[in-house]
Amino acid sequence: MLADKLTPFINRYNELGEMLSSPDITSDIKRMTTLSKERSSLEKIVEKAQEYKSVISQINDTKEMLYDAEMAEMAKEELKELEIQIPILENDIKLLLLPKDPNDDRNIIVELRAGAGGDEAAIFVGNLFEAYTRYADLKDWKVEILSSSPSDAGGYKEIIALIRGEQVYSRLKYEGGTHRVQRVPATESQGRVHTSAITVAVMPEVDDVEIQINENDLKIDVMRSSGCGGQSVNTTDSAVRITHLPTGLVVTNQDQKSQHKNKEKAMKVLKARLYDLEMQEAIAKDSANRSAQVGTGDRSGRIRTYNYPQNRMSDHRITLTLYRLAEIMQGGLMDEIIEPLIADHQSKIVEAAGL
């Protein structure tokens, strides 16, 4: 029973309360801080657990009243109201019992790349990046472009950005995958709909402590920066290309005039890619964990279609279709895509955990 699974949380919460009132703990600031954080992390689930147990107790008491002729009718009404609360509380508790993604609080590095479709794909990279930027503005997040490769036709062949803020990874991790766009290009005289595709990768930002890179594993090349059409935009060798020899990962950055700054940004992207690689390998080795990575793991899969003539956006992972594409691309409706993805993700974890 669910109630039995809640007992250890309540016991630990009470135990921590007693420990925090002990003179031995109050005199040790570091230990007290650690225990306080642990107790605080249990507060929500303990509150729900106590509410759940209270409702069950009230249901049992009310059932006893059914045998009293004078109280039976009133008891039936009370019982209905109480029993309605049980599935709601159980769902709330199950969500609180889910293992937390340790990366959810992190900032992200997001990479958008043009795929099939040539100029149209590059233009859509620009469109989708603008949608993410507008969404970030609504969330009070900060966007910093780390690297970009503009396209002659508009948009970008590739753009890499750092997005900082509260719960960024938890919201945008579902964007990883192939995004397909269907629309009539501006240069199309016959009005035919063209299909193109771009890829999006979303990686948690990591610090130097988490990813240690041996300098001997790096091959660093410097060169002159180039702009659209390949023309030189800098007379100094400021562009940097870093190759991580053990994995073959290559990162290039030329956005800054300073070679040092370009190297710093390239290293930030490389660390994120290495961390992401480790994370994906760990998921692949753990089948139980892999089954829980709904919407975050398969980078090659087509996750979404944007059909401009129909004003339609379809997310293929959860068969979600919205006929409000214009508003979505303005960033204002992004939550209407993300919330159902989170709900689907959580329901699959609940099922996998047997809750």
Curated annotation (Swiss-Prot):
InterPro entries assigned: PCRF (IPR005139), Pep_chain_release_fac_I (IPR000352), Pep_chain_release_fac_I_sf (IPR045853), Prokaryotic/Mito_RF (IPR050057), RF-1 (IPR004373)
- Keyword Protein biosynthesis assigned to the entry: answer is yes
Family recorded in the similarity comment? Belongs to the prokaryotic/mitochondrial release factor family.
Its PTM note reads: Methylated by PrmC. Methylation increases the termination efficiency of RF1.
Q: What lineage does UniProt assign to this protein's organism?
A: Bacteria, Pseudomonadati, Campylobacterota, Epsilonproteobacteria, Campylobacterales
NCBIfam families per UniProt: prfA, PRK00591.1
Report the protein's function: Peptide chain release factor 1 directs the termination of translation in response to the peptide chain termination codons UAG and UAA.
Q: Which domain of life is it from?
A: Bacteria
Instruction: Give the record's keywords alphabetically.
Output: Cytoplasm, Methylation, Protein biosynthesis
**Cellular compartment(s):** Cytoplasm
HAMAP family (UniProt xref) = Rel_fac_1
- Give the modified residues of type N5-methylglutamine: 231
GO molecular function terms noted in the UniProt entry: translation release factor activity, codon specific
The name this protein carries in UniProt is Peptide chain release factor 1
Q: Is Chaperone found in the keyword set?
A: no
Q: Which Pfam families match?
A: PCRF (PF03462), RF-1 (PF00472)
Q: Which GO terms describe its cellular component?
A: cytoplasm
Principal location listed in the UniProt entry: cytoplasm
